Amino acid sequence: MIDYIKGNLVAVEPAYLVVEANGIGFQIYCANPYRFINDLNREVVVPTHHYVREDSQRLFGFTTRTERLLFEKLLNVSGIGPKGALAILASGEPEDIIHAIEQEDEALLVRFPGVGKKTARQIILDLKGKLDDMAPMLEPAAGADKQQKNPQLEDALEALRALGYVEKELKKVEKQLKAETLETDEYIRRALALMLKRP
């Protein structure tokens, strides 16, 4: 088991990071590699999960150990593989996902990519009551950008502020926007549509 990779972050790609350690470039797949963009060409410490199958091996990386543990628990759910688990992590914060599972909030879970009602029920069935060990593990990994986890959303919110929208209005739609993975212009259009629907 490779617990973590410590080295120089030499590339950030849409699906993975490249971290050079001891002259070797490790390709590390992440839910959102751009969380590390501010640490390009700096030393990072990335918690990892070494996924091994007969025909392939991959390293998956995370911003926190909590995120990694949640990924590993999601892999134990029938019907969820590494791509599905990463898609869920890319679309929500670990604490929000854990809360949805513990509260049996199927409506929130089905918002995640690839999660239908059947899979949402399976996640709740398999994981409810088994996530208590994750609560104390919420500190970010060294090198992870905690403040700007979603640059596209932050840019969209800043643009909306420039248009004259106040924090109270933005807070009402921000949580829903966080559950989606969009480009900046798409976040702006989505936010405007949501605010127009509100009384």
Curated annotation (Swiss-Prot):
GO biological process: DNA recombination; DNA repair
Signal peptide: none
Residue ranges, annotated region (Domain III): 153-199
Keywords: Cytoplasm, DNA damage, DNA recombination, DNA repair, DNA-binding
InterPro entries cross-referenced by the UniProt entry: DNA_helicase_Holl-junc_RuvA_I, Hlx-hairpin-Hlx_DNA-bd_motif, NA-bd_OB-fold, RuvA, RuvA_2-like, RuvA_C, RuvA_C_sf
GO cellular component, one term: Holliday junction helicase complex
Region: Flexible linker, residue numbers: 143-153
Sections of the chain in a coiled coil: none
Cross-referenced Pfam families: HHH_5, RuvA_C, RuvA_N
Residue ranges, annotated region (Domain II): 64-142
Keyword DNA damage among UniProt keywords: yes
Subcellular location per the Swiss-Prot or TrEMBL entry: Cytoplasm
GO molecular function: ATP binding; four-way junction DNA binding; four-way junction helicase activity
Region (Domain I): 1-63
Function: The RuvA-RuvB-RuvC complex processes Holliday junction (HJ) DNA during genetic recombination and DNA repair, while the RuvA-RuvB complex plays an important role in the rescue of blocked DNA replication forks via replication fork reversal (RFR). RuvA specifically binds to HJ cruciform DNA, conferring on it an open structure. The RuvB hexamer acts as an ATP-dependent pump, pulling dsDNA into and through the RuvAB complex. HJ branch migration allows RuvC to scan DNA until it finds its consensus sequence, where it cleaves and resolves the cruciform DNA.
Family: Belongs to the RuvA family.
Domain notes: Has three domains with a flexible linker between the domains II and III and assumes an 'L' shape. Domain III is highly mobile and contacts RuvB.
Subunit structure, interactors included: Homotetramer. Forms an RuvA(8)-RuvB(12)-Holliday junction (HJ) complex. HJ DNA is sandwiched between 2 RuvA tetramers; dsDNA enters through RuvA and exits via RuvB. An RuvB hexamer assembles on each DNA strand where it exits the tetramer. Each RuvB hexamer is contacted by two RuvA subunits (via domain III) on 2 adjacent RuvB subunits; this complex drives branch migration. In the full resolvosome a probable DNA-RuvA(4)-RuvB(12)-RuvC(2) complex forms which resolves the HJ.
Name this protein carries in UniProt: Holliday junction branch migration complex subunit RuvA
The species this protein was found in: Shouchella clausii (strain KSM-K16)
Gene that specifies this protein: ruvA
